[in-house]
A protein has these predicted regions:
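Juxtamembrane transmembrane-helix boundary signature
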Residues: 18, 45-76, 85-96
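Membrane-interface loop-to-helix entry segments
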Residues: 134-164, 181, 362-370, 396, ...
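Hydrophobic alpha-helical segments and their helix-loop junctions in multi-pass secondary transporters
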Residues: 151-180, 190-209, 373-386, 410-423
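Transmembrane alpha-helical segments of multi-pass small-molecule transport proteins
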Residues: 15, 87, 112-136, 151-162, ...
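Hydrophobic transmembrane alpha-helices that form the core helical bundles
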Residues: 66, 82-114, 295-315, 354-355, ...
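Membrane-interface "cap" regions at the ends of multi-pass membrane proteins
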Residues: 1-27, 192, 218-229, 233
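Transmembrane-helix boundary/entry motifs in multi-pass membrane transporters
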Residues: 2-4, 39, 66-93, 112-119, ...
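Extracellular/periplasmic helix-exit of transmembrane alpha-helices
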Residues: 54-64, 211, 236-269
């Protein structure tokens, strides 16, 4: 028994880090908005996109365990132009993604400590904290923090969900008219929801980097099935929590006539009130602290993931010695942390106080570039780059092809809808 627990501790971490990046904005914000605006019908789309995206996230962990190199190294094997394209995709999206997550985290920070007067200084303080923690600390610190944070979120969400289901949905206001999903605005929101459900596919490279770092830190090389089991449990957790958040949004907001605010601090207050309304007013401060902790964990994971990915990509593209072990590698990691913080701050300031617009822009951007990364990952785990015994099963390959067709189809549909057929929606 003790040996089994010890093994679980040794392999747990990368999947939970993935869950942390997913739970922050896509669940706490987007899933709640989806339920509040469109009700339980949105759950079908949440489940569908989570299933179709699953293979491409799993392939990051699979490739790392099988080859003992990151999937970014795999992109280099596909050809230098492929790796360069990955770098371009990362640079084009990272400031919007990090800015969106940071903006939400700042809202919960302001709400918790009643610091709305700080304005942009709240996000500056958060970004500085992230850079300091990650540049001074090591993976072990991030790993342990995330385990605590995910536990807090799961417990509080399951409790709130259970109490909400017991109490039942609110009574719709008189003359309530449900929002139509199949309108231009509704479709754009659906694409935004699916873009980060459970998170952006280009973040799959982080799984492989975290898997390798966990092996290095724990000095334990798990079997492939152990690595995949840890990831699958974490992925399933993100799916279940997404359904819970949609349900919470539906039961508490749908039909109430209330609109979730666009200001990040006010939005945070609405989310926390959603919890406390079913758990009791006494829980407000507890939930506020838990929600901020979750968002802080998400922004830490995002900063770490992007900086690791950029670090490894630049090493492979521009350095002859790609050992990834040197002091210069650590310095480069810190440089990317600073660049990421600076660029993301500028992005947030450009969007002003428009929380929904920033999040929707970042999530739709992720959805449009998703098919490219999906194809890269599929080629790596089904071709000559991976041993036959470590390649995915036939059903997973079929699911992958279905996912690529789905993502590609919707990406093309978005481009046609946005730039050719209509000008009704703008950021």
């Amino acid at each position: 028994m003790i040996e089994a627990v010890s093994k679980i501790v040794k392999i747990s971490g990368p999947g939970l880090l993935f869950a942390s990046t997913a739970i922050g904005v896509s669940h706490l914000i987007q899933s709640t908005r989806a339920g509040a605006d469109f009700g339980l019908m949105i759950i079908g789309f949440v489940v569908l996109v989570s299933v179709l995206k699953y293979p491409f996230f799993e392939y990051g962990s699979r490739y790392a365990n099988s080859t003992q190199t990151s999937i970014i190294d795999g992109y280099k094997k596909l050809g230098t132009p492929i790796l360069a394209l990955y770098l371009i995709i990362t640079v084009c999206s990272m400031f919007f993604v990090t800015g969106a997550v940071g903006f939400v985290a700042a809202g919960f920070f302001e709400n918790l400590f009643n610091l709305e007067f700080l304005g942009e200084w709240s996000i500056i303080l958060l970004f500085i904290s992230c850079v300091l923690i990650l540049s001074i600390g090591k993976f072990n610190l991030l790993d342990n923090l995330i385990k605590i944070i995910v536990t807090i979120l799961v417990v509080s969400t399951v409790l709130a969900f259970s109490l909400t289901v017991i109490n039942g949905p609110i009574e719709p206001v008189k003359d309530f008219i449900p929002k139509e999903l199949w309108t231009t605005t509704g479709i754009f929101f659906l694409l935004a929801l699916m873009g980060w459900m459970p998170t952006a596919i280009d973040l799959s490279s982080w799984n492989s980097l975290w898997t390798l770092e966990k092996i290095k830190q724990s000095k334990y090389k798990p079997k492939l099935k152990e690595t995949l089991l840890e990831f699958r449990i974490s992925y399933l957790l993100t799916g279940i929590l997404a359904i819970m958040f949609v349900t919470l949004g539906t039961f508490i907001f749908y039909g109430s006539g209330e609109e979730l605010p666009n200001n990040n601090s006010q939005f945070a207050h609405s989310i926390i009130t959603m919890y406390s309304s079913v758990m009791g007013n006494w829980s407000y401060i507890v939930i506020a602290a838990s929600a901020f902790t979750v968002m802080f964990g998400t922004i830490l994971a995002v900063f770490d993931g992007y900086s690791r990915a950029l670090n490894r990509t630049v090493e492979l593209l521009f350095r002859k010695n790609n050992t990834n072990q040197s002091k210069s590698s650590r310095k480069l990691y810190t440089v990317f942390l600073i660049i990421l913080a600076s660029g993301s701050l500028v992005t947030v300031l450009q969007f002003g106080d428009n929380l929904k617009e920033l999040i929707d822009f970042a999530t739709i951007l992720s959805f449009v570039i998703a098919p490219v990364i999906a194809i890269f990952n599929y080629r790596l785990v089904t071709g000559k780059y991976l041993e036959k015994s470590h390649q995915p099963a036939v059903w997973l390959k079929i699911l992958s092809i279905s996912g690529i067709l789905f993502l590609s189809g919707f990406a093309v549909y978005f481009i046609l809808l946005k730039f050719i057929f209509t000008n009704q929606f703008s950021y």
